[in-house]
Curated annotation (Swiss-Prot):
Gene3D superfamilies: ATP-grasp fold, A domain (3.30.1490.20), ATP-grasp fold, B domain (3.30.470.20), Succinyl-CoA synthetase domains (3.40.50.261). It comes from Francisella philomiragia subsp. philomiragia (strain ATCC 25017 / CCUG 19701 / FSC 153 / O#319-036). Keywords: ATP-binding, Ligase, Magnesium, Metal-binding, Nucleotide-binding, Tricarboxylic acid cycle. This is Succinate--CoA ligase [ADP-forming] subunit beta. It comes from the Bacteria. ATP binds at residues 46, 53-55, 100, 103, 108. The lineage of its organism: Bacteria, Pseudomonadati, Pseudomonadota, Gammaproteobacteria, Thiotrichales. Transmembrane segments: none annotated.
Amino acid sequence: MNLHEYQAKDLLESYGLKVQKGIVAHNPNEAAQAFDQLGGKFAVVKAQVHAGGRGKAGGVKVVKSSQEAREVAESLIGTNLVTFQTDAEGQPVNSVGVFEDVYPVTRELYLGAVVDRSSRKVTFMASTEGGVDIEEVAHNTPEKILKVEVDPLVGLQPFQAREVAFKLGLEGKQINDFVKTMLGAYKAFVECDFALFEINPLAVRENGEIVCVDGKINLDSNALYRHPKLLALRDKSQENAKELKASEHELNYVALEGNIGCMVNGAGLAMATMDIIQLYGGKPANFLDVGGGATKERVIEAFKLILDDENVKAVLINIFGGIVRCDMIAEAIIEAVKEVNVTVPVVVRLEGNNAEKGAKILADSGLTLIPADGLADAADKVVKSLG
């Protein structure tokens, strides 16, 4: 689950980080009032969306008066902001953040952390190249990115943060401020179950103060049950409508741009199914994992979700029966096909627990379903069904 910038800054500030002061505004008048409240000569109005690249897309503007703040907010709120990280529709702008102007600054740094699956540790990354696309820095000049793996038994130690500060070229009070920032960020990361966080840029002001000018936080969705206050910050308007609907039925769904709908149980098998569709010349329209303990109701909802996509011209159902029984899946498929007006070819491959029984149920149903004897056969048939 992603947080908006203003939410991320509020959370980081509660852990002792110095952040760029700001006020969220949901309409132009609130934006004008926010400018006056901040009391500076300048302010920065930022569209609050769950996407990067806002500046290049026109979602970040410097304003010099409350009237300008009102006008910028009016031009952004109620629109969709399209950036390089969004789809063609963009993300809806329901609010803007009006932030104090911290510039000029002497330096812009980068600080971020992720759960590194290869090392199975929280890994911090820092760089002198802040304020730019960190992916480009990692690709073009990887030597400019410092990495620190944190031992989960002892946590991030002050000496590790100091070492990073030295390598970033910080000096004097800046070192202590950076150590406080990094330690606070780690504490927030662990206590709030972050999956990812970024401060880009982490600015060094002319007075030596270190300030978080931006903030990006992604929370581990599997841990949200123990963070009700953070869950209350969820902005469903920023989420893909189909993916949101899928999550309500405990389905793992990711929309893609192909025309072959996929319904599979198990994430690994789902990825293998998409790969083999591609191998046979097709294009998957989605990733959809109904889970190892799929119920009949969940399968029906999954089928509806796939067919809601107008781009889907054929469907491949690939089920390996382990915990889930193939005969139950077969009954759910029949019920779903009858409930939804299916006008596209449906290829079904069943293996494992009660597969023969499931195949017989489908064969006796009288529906025009296409049976497959293996994964390769299923991929071949679904691609050929497109004509």
